[in-house]
């Protein structure tokens, strides 16, 4: 069969996977219209407050809510985790009263001088990120949520917390330990094994903290960790899942875009966009190109050996679902659409995405049947709708809402699903449900009704952290100085005389030099005209950050990739009748299950497409 014809056929089949927006037993659902989008947005707002009020009334100040029993539990450090994680969602929803009262309570009551051993990764993305995002909102008139009485209390807490985590970075490789005691540092018996995501997903929060405090140490240690991981990449430019932070040896060489690695890729691109640091862009471009070359089995992604590219794990895991959203940010929208289509078909089959779905057996992976309210697929849906305005993503959003409302809602919040096939509930609600899951759902529908929210129509462009926290691209954070103390690093603002000359200020009238030891924002015009080169072209306008795929490796001595012969199975959700659509390009027909027979990872034109009749008549999905 002609290779061009095969790829055309493949593209047509993929475009049809989204055709199955079904209600009950094959009854077709109408596409979401503006009035319904507004109703869904309001419903999601109600979902947030059902869970937030449940936490505040039954669990606060413990870390997280047990929504079935209406009790609380300390799961991370015992410092009101869910409240901190929810702060910028409250601001996004325009809830000035609760945002203000929450910030004031945290500023007066929270402390980190506690004998608790915590995850460096989770504490950074949830607590440090939550504090920094809320600080940037509460201290800025332009956000519309400034708190008049606020005096940088959250920033003080953020710096205190980050300093308590610095001992974790004291390793020969620069890659941090996975855990640290907030009072005593790293325990002598602490494991030396950490995940790639755990060590390489700190640059946004630590970098922002350096910009706000004028102390480069936080940005330096986070960047050194990324360098330490990237320096140990394979000849194929792939990284493994787990590494020894002392020896630099990979203890798990499975490369992928999901569990244990996912946000490493995410923060490479986002750190460049936020800070304008081109070293991050270079690493991202090389890492992304290799991921697409060796991990991508269009539209799915597999795990391979980082040295040989041999497939070791033909499984879709739910953490991979962030990838289409990252691709949108990178300007690679077409493969993002195809992959999101495939991932969403798993949700349609079960009503949720299991932690693992085996692509060879077309079944939930053993031991990975749960859905812990993860946001990644919803996040990618938001980004794809923002990029395309295709109403199919609103339809997907409606399915998400229905699944959560009818399958996960509990007396005091929303429950984990322990088994996506039986829809069993578990008495736990992660803080990220309020930080991310409902946030992205609300943004999706708000965008459909000409939103006026902080993110889409606010004073700044925002980067979302991997925990969904809002980090603004502002001159204070994003502009690099012309003279830096280390390559690619933040240049501290220590030339007071130069700044005063440029800004026309008199140092003798500086009444604030001893009041507060943190960075005061300078006028934007002064920075751009006098001290800094200004926002980069990418920061201003955005463009594709993706490099073309390499056809020949630059080093001829590098080992050739060896790929095991195996079938990668592409599933659809359900066979449905033709769906009427007003929008151009929305067609529907019976959806086959598709398989790609294994071949060389570099010779996709040699792959065969096989079409099979769907044999699953009892696939479960929630629809409104």
Swiss-Prot record:
Cofactor(s) required, per the database record: Ca(2+)
Biased composition (Polar residues): 586-608
Alphabetized Gene3D superfamilies for the sequence: 1.50.10.10
Protein's pathway: Protein modification; protein glycosylation
Topology in membrane: Single-pass type II membrane protein
Residue numbers on the Lumenal membrane side: 29-624
GO CC, any one term: endoplasmic reticulum
The protein's Enzyme Commission number: 3.2.1.-
Cytoplasmic domain ranges by topology: 1-7
Database matches in Pfam families: Glyco_hydro_47
Binding site for Ca(2+): 466
A GO term for molecular function: mannosyl-oligosaccharide 1,2-alpha-mannosidase activity
Alphabetical UniProt keywords: Endoplasmic reticulum, Glycoprotein, Hydrolase, Membrane, Metal-binding, Signal-anchor, Transmembrane, Transmembrane helix
Regions that span the bilayer: 8-28
Localization terms from the record: Endoplasmic reticulum membrane
UniProt key word Transmembrane helix: yes
PANTHER family documented for this protein: ER DEGRADATION-ENHANCING ALPHA-MANNOSIDASE-LIKE PROTEIN 2
Role: Can convert Man(9)GlcNAc(2) and Man(8)GlcNAc(2) into N-glycans with a terminal alpha-1,6-linked Man residue in the C-branch. Functions in the formation of unique N-glycan structures that are specifically recognized by components of the endoplasmic reticulum-associated degradation (ERAD) machinery, which leads to the degradation of misfolded glycoproteins. Most likely generates N-glycan signal on misfolded glycoproteins that is subsequently recognized by OS9. Required for ERAD of the heavily glycosylated and misfolded BRI1 variants BRI1-5 and BRI1-9.
Name of the protein in question: Alpha-mannosidase I MNS4
Organism: Arabidopsis thaliana
């Amino acid at each position: 069969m002609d290779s061009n014809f095969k790829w055309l056929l493949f593209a047509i089949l993929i475009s049809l996977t989204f055709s199955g927006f079904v209600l009950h037993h094959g009854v077709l659902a109408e596409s979401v219209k503006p009035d319904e989008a507004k109703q869904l947005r309001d419903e999601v707002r109600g979902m947030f407050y059902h869970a937030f009020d449940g936490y505040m009334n039954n669990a606060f100040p413990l870390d997280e809510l047990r929504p079935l029993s209406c009790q609380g539990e300390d799961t991370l450090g015992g410092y009101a985790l869910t409240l901190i994680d929810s702060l910028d969602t409250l601001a996004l929803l325009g809830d000035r009263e609760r945002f203000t009262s929450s910030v004031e309570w945290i500023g007066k009551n929270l402390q980190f001088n506690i004998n608790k051993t915590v995850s460096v990764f989770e504490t950074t993305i949830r607590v440090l990120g939550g504090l920094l995002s809320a600080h940037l909102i509460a201290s800025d008139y332009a956000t519309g949520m400034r708190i008049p009485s606020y005096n940088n209390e959250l920033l003080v807490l953020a710096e205190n917390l980050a300093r308590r985590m610095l001992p974790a970075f004291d390793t020969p490789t620069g890659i941090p330990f996975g855990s640290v005691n907030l009072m005593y540092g790293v325990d002598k018996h602490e494991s030396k094994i950490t995940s790639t995501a755990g060590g390489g997903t700190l640059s946004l929060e630590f970098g922002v903290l350096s910009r706000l405090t004028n102390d480069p140490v936080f940005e330096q240690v986070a960047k050194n960790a990324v360098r330490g991981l990237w320096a140990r990449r394979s000849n194929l430019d792939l990284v493994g899942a787990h590494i020894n932070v002392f020896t630099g040896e990979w203890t798990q060489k499975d490369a992928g875009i999901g569990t244990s690695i996912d946000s490493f890729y995410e923060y490479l691109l986002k750190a460049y966009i936020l800070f304008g640091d081109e070293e991050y862009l270079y690493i991202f471009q090389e890492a992304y190109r290799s991921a697409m070359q060796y991990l991508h089995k269009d539209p799915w992604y597999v795990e391979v050996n980082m040295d040989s590219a041999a497939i070791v794990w033909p499984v879709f895991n739910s953490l991979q679902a962030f990838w289409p959203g990252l691709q949108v940010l990178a300007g690679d929208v077409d493969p993002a659409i195809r992959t999101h289509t495939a991932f969403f078909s798993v949700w349609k089959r079960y009503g949720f995405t299991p932690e693992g779905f085996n692509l060879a057996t077309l079944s939930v992976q053993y031991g990975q049947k749960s859905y812990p309210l993860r946001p990644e697929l919803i996040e990618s849906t938001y980004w794809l709708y923002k990029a395309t305005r295709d109403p199919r993503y609103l339809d997907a959003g409606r399915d998400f809402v229905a699944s959560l409302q009818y399958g996960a809602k509990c007396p005091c919040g929303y429950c984990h699903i322990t088994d996506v096939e039986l829809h069993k509930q578990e008495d736990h609600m992660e803080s990220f449900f309020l930080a991310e899951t409902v946030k992205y759902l609300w943004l999706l529908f708000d965008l459909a009704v000409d939103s006026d929210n902080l993110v889409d129509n606010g004073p700044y462009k925002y980067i979302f952290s991997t925990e969904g926290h809002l980090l603004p691209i502002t001159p204070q954070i994003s502009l690099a100085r012309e003279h830096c103390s280390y390559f690619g690093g933040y240049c501290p603002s220590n030339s007071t005389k130069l700044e005063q000359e440029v800004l026309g200020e008199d140092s003798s009238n500086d009444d604030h030099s001893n009041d507060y030891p943190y960075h005061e924002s300078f006028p934007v015009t002064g920075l751009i005209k006098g001290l800094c080169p200004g926002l980069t072209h990418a920061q201003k306008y955005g463009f594709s950050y993706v490099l073309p795929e390499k056809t020949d490796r630059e080093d001829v001595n590098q080992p050739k990739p060896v790929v095991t012969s195996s079938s990668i199975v592409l599933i659809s959700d359900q066979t449905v009748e033709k769906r009427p659509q007003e929008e151009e390009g929305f067609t529907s027909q019976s959806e086959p299950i598709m398989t790609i027979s294994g071949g060389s990872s570099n010779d996709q034109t040699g792959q065969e497409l096989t079409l099979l009749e769907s044999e699953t008549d009892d696939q479960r999905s929630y629809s409104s």
